[in-house]
Regions:
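Switch/connector loops and helix/strand junctions flanking conserved nucleotide-binding motifs
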Residues: 1-3, 23-24, 146-147
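Short regulatory helix/loop adjacent to the ATP-binding pocket of P-loop NTPases
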Residues: 1-14
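Conserved AAA+ ATPase "SRH/arginine-finger" region at the nucleotide-binding site
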Residues: 13-24, 42-43
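Hydrophobic/aromatic beta-strand patches that form the interior of the parallel beta-sheet core
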Residues: 13-16, 30, 138
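An amphipathic alpha-helix signature
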Residues: 22-27, 50-54
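A residue-level signal for conserved active-site and pocket-lining positions in enzyme catalytic cores
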Residues: 25, 33, 76
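Extended, charged alpha-helical "arm/stalk" segments used for dimerization and assembly
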Residues: 29-40, 52
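Accessory nucleic acid-recognition modules appended to NTPase machines
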Residues: 43, 47-174
Length: 174
């Protein structure tokens, strides 16, 4: 796509498509999220999310960056899902994975560019503070976040300590 965007400068429009929102499709909820495949075939959601994560890691991440250890990157994505709705502390994320803070920054950038996460800056009257204060981290799709933290059914979701953060993330992604 890089070559195309350079040669078509000024003559092409690029759109970022996110999973369906609640307004766009009535079946969207915290557990399923908004990916059309999961909404239409909820009985294969677990298989679909596993395949999505695998192909995302093998194809998309490798196309964007030369990540040496995809196993650690996969653990990083799972750790982020468990921190959904939290203030982003790169040091606290880097330490248990045994990677550096600059590596975490690079990996966050990859997830953000590929449309997996959003970082929501805090609101302050002072615009400068908005830019430097710690953002909150959310996954674009709550169904994917549920899958990554091991929530597979409604009962687990109802009992999960992540439920509030997942709801907050779903609102942020709308």
């Amino acid at each position: 796509m890089r070559g195309v965007s350079e040669s078509m400068a000024g003559r092409v429009a690029l759109f970022s498509l996110f999973p369906f929102s609640r307004e766009e499709h009535p079946a969207v909820d915290l557990l399923t999220g908004g990916f059309p495949e999961v909404i239409e075939q909820a009985d294969v959601a677990d298989l679909w999310f596993r395949s999505y994560v695998q192909t995302y890691l093998e194809r998309d991440v490798r196309a964007v960056a030369a990540i040496r250890d995809l196993t650690v990157f996969r653990r990083f994505v799972g750790l982020l899902a468990s921190r959904c709705g939290s203030m982003l502390n790169k040091t606290d994320i880097a330490a248990p994975l045994g990677v550096s803070v600059p590596t975490v920054s690079q990996w966050l950038s990859i997830l953000e560019v590929t449309g997996q996460i959003i970082l929501v800056q805090p609101f302050f009257e002072n615009f400068g503070k908005r830019l430097v204060k710690t953002p909150k981290l959310y996954f674009v799709d709550s169904g994917l976040a549920c899958h990554l933290v091991g929530i597979r059914d409604r009962e687990s979701l109802d009992r999960s300590p992540f439920r509030g953060a997942l709801f907050e993330g779903a609102v942020a992604a709308e």
